Amino acid sequence: AGFSLDMTGMENIYLKGYLLGLNDDQIKEIEQDIIDFADLGEYIDQPVRTYSSGMKMRLGFAININIKPDILVVDEALSVGDADFQKKCRDKINDVIATGVTVLFVSHSRKAIEETCTRAIFLKDGKVQVDGTVEEAFDAYDKKK
């Protein structure tokens, strides 16, 4: 997630915001949404080096989903965390998609892809095998197994 490990979660929210071109007011506007979504409790004020990998993922996802990106890249975000957090992520991704943001969703979970995507690209050995509907991509995948 590209965190500064000696900085706190809160400091990393601002660092990521600055790196993405946001100013103090813009970051302050989304700060509480990030904190609430990440749900790290008191750990938000602890150095990121004390976080588990799941906690880092939660904070990274919370930052990236709340900055209102033009393109959102989600790489296996739904493979970690408990079922409640995974559902919260799916719901938030669907909210972002509904606003017209392009989402590049990378997953090995058939269910997650079917619930999230309207288009899929099936890659094998780094080459595009199918670029079409989710059903077309899975049909091709099932035949190649």
Task: Label every PLM stretch briefly.
Residues 14, 26-43, 60:
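Conserved ABC ATPase "signature" region
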